[in-house]
Amino acid sequence: TAIMSIFGCSPRKYFFGRAPLEAAASGIRLAPGDACYRCNMVTYADEDVPFEHKHIISHSAGSIEGRESDELVTMLFDHPDFRPLAEQAGMVIHKGSSFRHLAVQSHVDIKGIQLAPPHDHLGEEIGPILPTGCPNADVLRELMRRAFDILDQHPINVARRAAGKLPANGVWFWAEGTAAALPNFPEHYGSDGGVVSAVPLCHGIGILTGLEAVTVPTATGEWDTDYAAKVAAALGVLKKHDFVALHLEGPDEATHNHDLEHKIYSIERLSADVVAPVTEALRAAGEDFRLLLLSDHMTYMANGAHGADPVPFVLYDSRVSDGSGLPYSEANGRKGPYVDDGAELMDLLFELKKL
């Protein structure tokens, strides 16, 4: 919902689930009665306990690379012990990037269903956070249980353990939703543009709002992404359009993994290799510009989970010389103006509203 707000779409009005937004990025069209879920490849701890008592230790199977992830999820949905159950549930899988896949279930009622984001429950026993709330939740739980039985000792996971990597020994359904429609960005703001991101959610929101989705082949969505290529792609968008949204996921993923070293590294690269060259290029172009810098939400090192605390933002205008003079940080953000509704930030950027 935070990313939607940044694009000026109030989640209170337009949010129908995260997975349908990601589906839009992949060209997946949802029909009436369809439900879409994110299907993460995850890691359960190696422990000899019933499935409900297992602990989830990675929401991304150790940031599994795409080839192995694709091979595992394809094998799973073709497996004779899994395929009949998936077909009975009306579920098909759409392969995504790295650990992120999408599952679409046809002719299903998900009213009341409760699914938990895996990244908010790392280290926890899964029993209390397995799907619940409606009859279809039982179907998803059985699919998840069956997936573990099939995936745990698959040769790919045996090899991953031997190499010191986390196995992708489970799938996790979450981010449920139905078909979504969002307001047209160019019509509302009078500017067309594009979205540069390695995350399907951002591309999906961009597509549904009438923006161009730009893919950078060397972008990983992690701390080791190709920062220079993403900057080049963003500046390329501005040669054709008036607006670009440049998104980086590295600090968030590092925090989910409790990886302080690479969280700091990502932030330093963001400052030196993204914000600085983008700002310099805009100044060199010789035209007035405005720049909005912010994160979409907090992610805490203490527990690796997302949080709803306000995030600091910078709104820079090349026509204005005076500013706060303070470094960009959470502490200094609290000293500045407070915007209660995140969907108003884009109005501020385009000067439709004032602070």
Regions found by a protein language model. Give the residues of each.
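Feature captures the catalytic ectodomains and active-site-proximal regions of enzymes
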Residues: T1-L355
